[in-house]
C-alpha cells in the first residue's frame, strides 16, 4: 500500500495514490520505445551467452521484459524478485534515479503484487514465480543458470545487497549479468565489493552504466 504522512508525521495508507502511481509506471514501461530497449537488452545478453537458459532469477524485475524474452525463446523458468508496495512508503518517481538505498525508509516506489502479477499475466509472462524481496522463499535446491538485474541491483543499490542470495542459488556454471552504475567513464564502476567484473556485455548506457558479467568472490 502506498502511504503518505498525516499532520503528526505518521504514515497512513493512500490507495488512490498507489493506484495512480502504478498506472503511470505501467504507461512508461509498456511504450513501444521502452519495450524496444528492453528487447535490445535481451538480444545483447542472449548473443553474449549463446546458450539456452533453464532457470533465471531476475532481481528487481518490474515487468520482466528481458526475462520474458528468455521465456519466449527457451521456455525458461523465471523467478521474479521485486518489492511489494504494501511494504514501502510513498516516494516520488523522480527522486530515486542514481541514489543508492539500503534501508527500509529509503525504498522507492513499487507496485502491489496484485497489480504486478496481473500485469505480468496481461503481458503474456509464463512459467514464473513472483517473489517478495521482504519474504524471499526459494527452495534450497533451486540453482539458477542465469541471474540478472536490470537498472536495479548494482544500479539503484549495491550488488552486495543480494550477494548471499546469489551464492546460495548458484551452481558452478551460473552466469550473473547486471547493470552496474558508472561514474565519469563507462569503465569506472561504482560499488565493486564482493565481486569482480568478468566482461562488459554492453556499454549502451554510456558513462552512467554498463551491463556486465560478474564473478562472485
Q: What are the roles of these predicted feature ranges?
A:
Residues 4-49:
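Class I SAM-dependent methyltransferase Rossmann-like catalytic core
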Residues 53-62, 79:
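Conserved class I S-adenosyl-L-methionine
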Residues 63-75:
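Conserved SAM-binding loop of SAM-dependent methyltransferases across substrates and taxa
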Residues 145-158:
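A short SAM/SAH-binding and catalytic strip from SAM-dependent methyltransferases
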Residues 136-147:
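A short acidic, Gly/Pro-enriched loop at the edge of an enzyme's catalytic core
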Residues 97-137:
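S-adenosyl-L-methionine
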Residues 160-172:
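A short glycine-rich, Lys/Arg-flanked "PGG" loop and its adjoining helix->strand segment in the class I
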Residues 173-181:
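Conserved beta-strand signature within the Rossmann-like core of class I S-adenosyl-L-methionine
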Amino acid at each position: 500500500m502506498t502511504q503518505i504522512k498525516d499532520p503528526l508525521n505518521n504514515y497512513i495508507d493512500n490507495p488512490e495514490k498507489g493506484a495512480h502511481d502504478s498506472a503511470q509506471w505501467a504507461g512508461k514501461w509498456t511504450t513501444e520505445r521502452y519495450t524496444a530497449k528492453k528487447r535490445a537488452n535481451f538480444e545483447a545478453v542472449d548473443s553474449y551467452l549463446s546458450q539456452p537458459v533453464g532457470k533465471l532469477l531476475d532481481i528487481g524485475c518490474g515487468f520482466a521484459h528481458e526475462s520474458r524474452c528468455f521465456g519466449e525463446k527457451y521456455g525458461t523458468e523465471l523467478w521474479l524478485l521485486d518489492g511489494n508496495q504494501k511494504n514501502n512508503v510513498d516516494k516520488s518517481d523522480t527522486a530515486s534515479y542514481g541514489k543508492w538505498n539500503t534501508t527500509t525508509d529509503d525504498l522507492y516506489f513499487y507496485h502491489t503484487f496484485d497489480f504486478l502479477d496481473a500485469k505480468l499475466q496481461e503481458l503474456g509472462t509464463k512459467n514464473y514465480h513472483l517473489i517478495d524481496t521482504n519474504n524471499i522463499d526459494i527452495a534450497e535446491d533451486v540453482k539458477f543458470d542465469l541471474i540478472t538485474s536490470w537498472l536495479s541491483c548494482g544500479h539503484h543499490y549495491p550488488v552486495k545487497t543480494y550477494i548471499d542470495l546469489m551464492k546460495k542459488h548458484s551452481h558452478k556454471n551460473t552466469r550473473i549479468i547486471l547493470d552496474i552504475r558508472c561514474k565519469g567513464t563507462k569503465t569506472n564502476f561504482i560499488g565493486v565489493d564482493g565481486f569482480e567484473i568478468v566482461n562488459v556485455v554492453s556499454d549502451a548506457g554510456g558513462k552512467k552504466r554498463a551491463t556486465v558479467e560478474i564473478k562472485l568472490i
